[in-house]
Amino acid sequence: MSATREREDGQDYRRIFLQDIPLIDVRAPVEFQQGAFANAVNLPLMNDDERQAVGTCYKQQGQQAAIALGHSLVNGRLREQRTAAWLAQCAQWPEGYIYCFRGGLRSQLVQQWLREAGVAYPRITGGYKALRNFLLTTLEQSAELPMVLIGGNTGSGKTLLVNELADGVDLEGAAHHRGSSFGRTLVSQSGQIDFENRLAVLLLKKQHGGCRRWVLEDEGRIIGSNNLPLPVFNRMQQAPVAVIDDPFEVRLARLQHEYIDRMRIEFEQAYGAQLGWQKYDEYLHHGLFAIRRRLGLERFQLLTQHLERALQYQQASGNSDEHQQWLVPLLQHYYDPMYHYQLEKKSQRIVFRGNYAEVREFLMTYSQNNGE
């Protein structure tokens, strides 16, 4: 990339997110960790300590002194190293943009140093703050579209159905968590801001693809450590609900496949047989431990004993059927009564009940009749 092909600074935020245009975030690492975008990489102008020193100088001595300190801190060999990293990223991402917090001094300075090295690279007008505000507005506007929720007991396949439908929005997928005490995945949950940004981009892309209504899983406000954005959650509290009523045996088989068989495979693929089994064992024990108070001490201890026997049998034989000895009472005495109570409060909003296939057919028809 050379200075002869110069692009203007960018403020078409919609295009940036729709096309996953790469972004170089020159904020300090602590700022990036607090919230950023999936299409961004952090190559900071200043590290956290340097940023703190410049910020203190700004408060005590003003802008000019702070700028001078920044230049003295990032100078000589350090400036060369960081410029080399930016140049390498610019070459890898010739269609990208630079941004800092507000599109001000930091991104302007990086832009200037790149230009001195022979590379013209545009920055985002308004910086991170403008991009973030665009996504917050997207969330608010998206929440105004019609919604329908998929309800049903644990194991009903609600998330599966959401992902089958073109206008389905997988909130749990965006949160990297499946909602229950056993809901964590091998992908760590990100912070609240990253979750909101990821969800906003997902909604933006679906609207761009023609979605005019959302199908969502009937969720609580909290998914793992992430909270649903209030505009979305508040609209969900008014949305009609289609309930999957699958037989207990069907739900049990789904849970055994998803939380037992599949998770063992995923842990062992990620960590190898020995460590993977250990982490799989810890994952199941942690899931039970997290709800021990709601289960009561006696039931928790009994289910833990069943779990440990099931793990021993599974490790020895490769057969996971023994896990039903604790999954069945967990459903019957904990998850099913809890969801029944929650669903009763939404009874006036239930528009359809049926098995998985019937709810799927209903939602496809309902989309045509009520999605505009």
Curated annotation (Swiss-Prot):
Reaction(s) catalyzed by this protein?
5-methylaminomethyl-2-thiouridine(34) in tRNA + selenophosphate + (2E)-geranyl diphosphate + H2O + H(+) = 5-methylaminomethyl-2-selenouridine(34) in tRNA + (2E)-thiogeraniol + phosphate + diphosphate; 5-methylaminomethyl-2-thiouridine(34) in tRNA + (2E)-geranyl diphosphate = 5-methylaminomethyl-S-(2E)-geranyl-thiouridine(34) in tRNA + diphosphate; 5-methylaminomethyl-S-(2E)-geranyl-thiouridine(34) in tRNA + selenophosphate + H(+) = 5-methylaminomethyl-2-(Se-phospho)selenouridine(34) in tRNA + (2E)-thiogeraniol; 5-methylaminomethyl-2-(Se-phospho)selenouridine(34) in tRNA + H2O = 5-methylaminomethyl-2-selenouridine(34) in tRNA + phosphate
Q: Which InterPro entries match?
A: P-loop_NTPase (IPR027417), Rhodanese-like_dom (IPR001763), Rhodanese-like_dom_sf (IPR036873), SelU (IPR017582)
> Which cysteine-cysteine pairs are annotated as disulfide bonds in the entry?
none
Q: What biological processes does GO assign it?
A: tRNA wobble uridine modification
Q: Which domain of life is it from?
A: Bacteria
Q: Which UniProt keywords apply?
A: Selenium, Transferase
Record-linked SUPFAM superfamilies = P-loop containing nucleoside triphosphate hydrolases, Rhodanese/Cell cycle control phosphatase
Coiled-coil stretches are: none
Assembly: Monomer.
Give the protein's function.
Involved in the post-transcriptional modification of the uridine at the wobble position (U34) of tRNA(Lys), tRNA(Glu) and tRNA(Gln). Catalyzes the conversion of 2-thiouridine (S2U-RNA) to 2-selenouridine (Se2U-RNA). Acts in a two-step process involving geranylation of 2-thiouridine (S2U) to S-geranyl-2-thiouridine (geS2U) and subsequent selenation of the latter derivative to 2-selenouridine (Se2U) in the tRNA chain.
> What is the protein name stated in its UniProt record?
tRNA 2-selenouridine synthase
The organism of origin for this protein: Serratia proteamaculans (strain 568)
Q: What is the lineage of its organism?
A: Bacteria, Pseudomonadati, Pseudomonadota, Gammaproteobacteria, Enterobacterales
As recorded in Swiss-Prot or TrEMBL, the protein's gene is named selU
